[in-house]
Amino acid sequence: MDDAIAISRHDDCPEDAARIVDTGLGEANDAAAPLHEVRPISCFARLSSGEVIGGAVGRTWGACCELQQLWVSPSYRRRGLGARLVREFEAHAQARGCERFYLETFSFQSPSLYRSLGYVAAYEHAVYPHGIVKYVMVKPAPATTPRTSSP
């Protein structure tokens, strides 16, 4: 290793250095995989006034869909809106050809909601303080009834 190289430690993330790392990683990833095929996907719940009171945001790539964010305004929680948003999000992704879904969630977020919608924990990372667990959850798309041709 070159003796002229120094490694620095930080308790924050200097923007200029982080930008260099992000750009370099992006270039390496783009050279290795067709990431231009990754597409954003979302759905939102709005009041008649147009105010957004919830949303599901993610991305699709091939037959895979990642739900990255789910949020419902506190005054509209516990009414089934989160489940409706996830179902609409999944239906939209299935229309794109997605057959598999995944997400990451913490134990203080909504793992029980996702379980009720058919997600299972593929991995549990129980290393955080205060008993907090991070889950990686997966769900296959529902099987469709195969079309049969008429005789």
Model-inferred region functions:
Residues 1-13, 143-151:
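Conserved N-terminal entry element of GNAT/NAT acetyltransferase domains
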Residues 21, 114, 119:
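Conserved active-site tyrosine of GNAT-family acetyltransferases
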Residues 39-56, 84:
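Conserved beta-hairpin
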Residues 51-59, 64-71:
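Conserved beta-strand in the GNAT
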Residues 102-104, 120-138:
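Conserved catalytic-core motifs of GNAT/GCN5-like acyltransferases
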